Amino acid sequence: MLLVDLREFARGPVETRAELAGDDPLFEGLGAALAGPVRVTGRLQAAGEARFYWRGSLDTIVATECRRCLRAVSVPVKADIHALFTKDHDALEDPDSYPLAREATEIDLRPAVREELLLAVPQWGVLCQDDCRGLCPRCGRDLNAGPCGCAPAVDHRWQELAALKGKLRD
């Protein structure tokens, strides 16, 4: 339940709980594939005149690839959500605030879920393991499976220094 009717606040804070499918249109353009549902829980409460504060959390699994060897990797993603929904447009200077129309009768929590998920998804790639060796730059073999047999690359910029080192040993 991520659409909350404002009349529900007559009974006090509103508990929110939802499970959104990974292919929900809300997550289009996210830049990551969701490998499971997005589970959202939280508590929405009135925080003054025409202001509502939502504190919650989300968790899901993102399917991505290792940035070194390109193996498929599943990464658990968890995030806390703190959002202020307000009809007072002077309070919108806070980056965690969301505007409500003055005539609004419900609060849509989905934009806050999307934004927090977008911020929580790893942007710079992940590793399949901390010591991932990646791919051979010559043949493309996965070096985690063992050596590829390619000759080590020689950096010709260091040949003069290697020759000098050889002369000093003699």
Q: Which stretches of residues belong to each language-model region?
A:
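Structured interface patches
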Residues: 1-170
